[in-house]
C-alpha cells in the first residue's frame, strides 16, 4: 500500500483531535504568505503572479475590486509615496481557505497607520481567487490619530517587530 497522502505533513492539534495538514493546504498557506510579503517588498510582479485573473478583493465595508489587473493597478497607484508592512500573527488553512490574523501598516511618507486585520483567502490552482479583509473602522481611526501624533512626537510612532 502507498503512503497515506493525509500523512505527508505533521498533524495539527485542535482540541483533542489531530487534523492532518495536506500538502495542498501547506501550498495554499505558502501562497498567501508569499503574496503578503511580496506586497510588503513592493514586488508587484510576484504579488500579481499569486492572484487569479478573476480575483475578488474586498475590504469589508468598502467597494469590492474585481480582477487581478484592477488590484495591481490599485497597489501600483499607491507607488513611491507609500509603503505597506505586514506581520502575520496566525495563519490557518483548510483546503482552499486560508485565514490570517495580522497587523498591517500603511505608510504615507512620515505618517504610519498600523491596525489589526483578519483576512480570508481562497486559493485555487496556486492562485488567490478571493481576498477578503475584515478590520475595525474605529481601530483604523485610532491608528490615524496615533499616526498623526507620531508626526509631532516620533516616539509615539507604531512599529512592527521583524517578521
Task: Give a label for each model feature.
Residues 32-35, 46-48, 55, 67, ...:
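Hydrophobic pocket/interface hotspot
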Residues 18, 22-23, 76-163:
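A beta-strand edge to alpha-helix "cap/lid" segment located at domain peripheries
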Residues 44-48, 52-96:
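A solvent-exposed, acidic/Ser-Thr-rich amphipathic alpha-helical stretch
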Residues 11-49, 53, 158-163:
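Short, low-complexity N-terminal intrinsically disordered segments enriched in polar/charged residues
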Amino acid at each position: 500500500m502507498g503512503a497515506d497522502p493525509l500523512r505527508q505533513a505533521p498533524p495539527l492539534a485542535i482540541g483533542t483531535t489531530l487534523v492532518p495538514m495536506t500538502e495542498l493546504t501547506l501550498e495554499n498557506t505558502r501562497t498567501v504568505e508569499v503574496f503578503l510579503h511580496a506586497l510588503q517588498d513592493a514586488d508587484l510582479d510576484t504579488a500579481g503572479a499569486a492572484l487569479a485573473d478573476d480575483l475578488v478583493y474586498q475590504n469589508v465595508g468598502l467597494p469590492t475590486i474585481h480582477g487581478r489587473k484592477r488590484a495591481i493597478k490599485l497597489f501600483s497607484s499607491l507607488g513611491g509615496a507609500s509603503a505597506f508592512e505586514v506581520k502575520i500573527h496566525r495563519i490557518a488553512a483548510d483546503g482552499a481557505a486560508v485565514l490570517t490574523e495580522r497587523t498591517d501598516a500603511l505608510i504615507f511618507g512620515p505618517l504610519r497607520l498600523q491596525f489589526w486585520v483578519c483576512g480570508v483567502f481562497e486559493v485555487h490552482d496556486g492562485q488567490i481567487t478571493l481576498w477578503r479583509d475584515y478590520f475595525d473602522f474605529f481601530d483604523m481611526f485610532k491608528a490615524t490619530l496615533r499616526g498623526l501624533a507620531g508626526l509631532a512626537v516620533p516616539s509615539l510612532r507604531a512599529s512592527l517587530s521583524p517578521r
